[in-house]
Protein backbone atom coordinates (compact mmCIF):
# COMPACT_ATOMS: atom_id res chain seq x y z
CA UNK A 1 0.00 0.00 0.00
CA UNK A 2 1.19 3.53 -0.66
CA UNK A 3 -0.73 5.20 2.15
CA UNK A 4 0.62 8.57 3.31
CA UNK A 5 3.53 8.07 5.65
CA UNK A 6 5.41 11.33 5.85
CA UNK A 7 4.92 15.06 6.32
CA UNK A 8 5.93 17.53 3.65
CA UNK A 9 6.07 21.34 3.85
CA UNK A 10 5.23 23.22 0.64
CA UNK A 11 6.01 26.94 0.26
CA UNK A 12 6.08 27.54 -3.53
CA UNK A 13 4.25 26.11 -6.55
CA UNK A 14 3.23 22.97 -4.62
CA UNK A 15 0.84 25.08 -2.55
CA UNK A 16 -1.42 24.95 -5.63
CA UNK A 17 -3.86 22.22 -4.56
CA UNK A 18 -4.85 20.94 -7.99
CA UNK A 19 -1.25 20.78 -9.20
CA UNK A 20 -0.08 19.10 -5.99
CA UNK A 21 -2.86 16.48 -6.19
CA UNK A 22 -2.07 15.81 -9.85
CA UNK A 23 1.61 15.37 -9.08
CA UNK A 24 1.19 13.50 -5.78
CA UNK A 25 -2.00 11.49 -5.90
CA UNK A 26 -1.82 10.29 -2.28
CA UNK A 27 -1.16 13.75 -0.88
CA UNK A 28 -3.52 15.19 1.71
CA UNK A 29 -3.51 18.87 2.66
CA UNK A 30 -3.46 19.01 6.45
CA UNK A 31 -3.19 22.68 7.35
CA UNK A 32 -1.29 25.90 6.88
CA UNK A 33 1.75 26.43 9.09
CA UNK A 34 4.58 28.94 9.43
CA UNK A 35 8.23 27.92 9.20
CA UNK A 36 10.01 30.15 11.70
CA UNK A 37 13.43 31.78 11.27
CA UNK A 38 13.41 31.38 7.49
CA UNK A 39 12.46 33.71 4.68
CA UNK A 40 11.11 33.17 1.20
CA UNK A 41 13.12 34.13 -1.87
CA UNK A 42 13.32 33.32 -5.61
CA UNK A 43 16.49 32.35 -7.44
CA UNK A 44 18.38 30.20 -10.00
CA UNK A 45 17.90 30.14 -13.75
CA UNK A 46 14.45 28.67 -13.05
CA UNK A 47 13.53 31.72 -10.92
CA UNK A 48 11.92 29.33 -8.47
CA UNK A 49 11.02 29.64 -4.80
CA UNK A 50 13.62 28.91 -2.15
CA UNK A 51 13.96 29.43 1.58
CA UNK A 52 16.94 30.66 3.55
CA UNK A 53 17.64 31.09 7.27
CA UNK A 54 16.65 34.52 8.58
CA UNK A 55 16.10 35.34 12.23
CA UNK A 56 12.63 36.53 13.28
CA UNK A 57 11.24 35.90 9.81
CA UNK A 58 8.63 33.35 8.75
CA UNK A 59 7.74 31.42 5.62
CA UNK A 60 4.02 30.65 5.35
CA UNK A 61 3.28 27.29 3.80
CA UNK A 62 1.27 24.12 3.87
CA UNK A 63 1.67 20.82 5.62
CA UNK A 64 0.84 17.80 3.46
CA UNK A 65 0.79 14.11 4.24
CA UNK A 66 2.50 12.25 1.38
CA UNK A 67 3.36 8.66 0.48
CA UNK A 68 6.74 7.23 -0.47
CA UNK A 69 5.75 7.28 -4.16
CA UNK A 70 4.67 10.93 -3.81
CA UNK A 71 8.10 11.72 -2.39
CA UNK A 72 9.74 10.10 -5.43
CA UNK A 73 7.59 12.24 -7.74
CA UNK A 74 8.56 15.38 -5.82
CA UNK A 75 12.23 14.39 -5.99
CA UNK A 76 11.97 14.31 -9.78
CA UNK A 77 10.01 17.57 -9.98
CA UNK A 78 12.42 19.36 -7.62
CA UNK A 79 15.44 17.96 -9.49
CA UNK A 80 16.74 16.43 -6.24
CA UNK A 81 19.65 16.31 -5.40
CA UNK A 82 20.99 18.61 -8.17
CA UNK A 83 18.85 21.74 -7.79
CA UNK A 84 17.21 21.10 -4.42
CA UNK A 85 18.30 19.21 -1.32
CA UNK A 86 16.11 18.06 1.56
CA UNK A 87 15.77 20.01 4.77
CA UNK A 88 14.09 18.47 7.81
CA UNK A 89 12.50 20.25 10.75
CA UNK A 90 10.16 19.34 13.56
CA UNK A 91 6.60 20.56 13.89
CA UNK A 92 4.74 19.51 17.05
CA UNK A 93 7.41 16.82 17.57
CA UNK A 94 6.79 15.38 14.11
CA UNK A 95 9.48 15.31 11.45
CA UNK A 96 8.70 17.36 8.35
CA UNK A 97 10.54 17.35 5.01
CA UNK A 98 10.92 20.30 2.67
CA UNK A 99 13.25 21.24 -0.18
CA UNK A 100 15.83 24.01 -0.28
CA UNK A 101 18.13 24.98 -3.14
CA UNK A 102 21.65 23.59 -3.19
CA UNK A 103 23.22 26.69 -4.81
CA UNK A 104 22.27 29.94 -3.16
CA UNK A 105 22.50 32.17 -6.24
CA UNK A 106 21.24 35.76 -6.22
CA UNK A 107 17.59 36.79 -6.23
CA UNK A 108 15.79 36.50 -9.57
CA UNK A 109 12.24 37.67 -10.10
CA UNK A 110 9.97 34.70 -10.94
CA UNK A 111 8.20 34.35 -14.29
CA UNK A 112 4.59 35.50 -14.42
CA UNK A 113 3.38 31.95 -15.00
CA UNK A 114 5.24 30.55 -12.00
CA UNK A 115 4.23 33.45 -9.77
CA UNK A 116 0.56 32.97 -10.70
CA UNK A 117 0.76 29.32 -9.62
CA UNK A 118 2.28 30.36 -6.29
CA UNK A 119 -0.38 33.09 -5.84
CA UNK A 120 -3.12 30.55 -6.55
CA UNK A 121 -1.51 28.27 -3.97
CA UNK A 122 -1.57 31.07 -1.40
CA UNK A 123 -5.32 31.38 -2.05
CA UNK A 124 -5.87 27.61 -1.90
CA UNK A 125 -4.12 27.42 1.48
CA UNK A 126 -5.44 30.75 2.76
CA UNK A 127 -1.94 32.14 3.38
CA UNK A 128 -0.97 35.73 4.15
CA UNK A 129 0.43 37.23 0.92
CA UNK A 130 2.38 39.85 2.91
CA UNK A 131 5.42 37.57 2.99
CA UNK A 132 5.14 36.74 -0.69
CA UNK A 133 5.05 40.45 -1.58
CA UNK A 134 8.06 41.04 0.67
CA UNK A 135 9.98 38.26 -1.08
CA UNK A 136 9.42 39.94 -4.46
CA UNK A 137 11.04 43.25 -3.55
CA UNK A 138 14.48 42.07 -2.47
What is the role of each PLM region?
Residues 4-138:
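Glycine-aromatic micro-motifs
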Amino acid sequence: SSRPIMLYFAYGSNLHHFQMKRRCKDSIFIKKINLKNFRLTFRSKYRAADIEPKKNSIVPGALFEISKSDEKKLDIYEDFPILYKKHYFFYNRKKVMTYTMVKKSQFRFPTERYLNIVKRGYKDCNLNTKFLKKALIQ
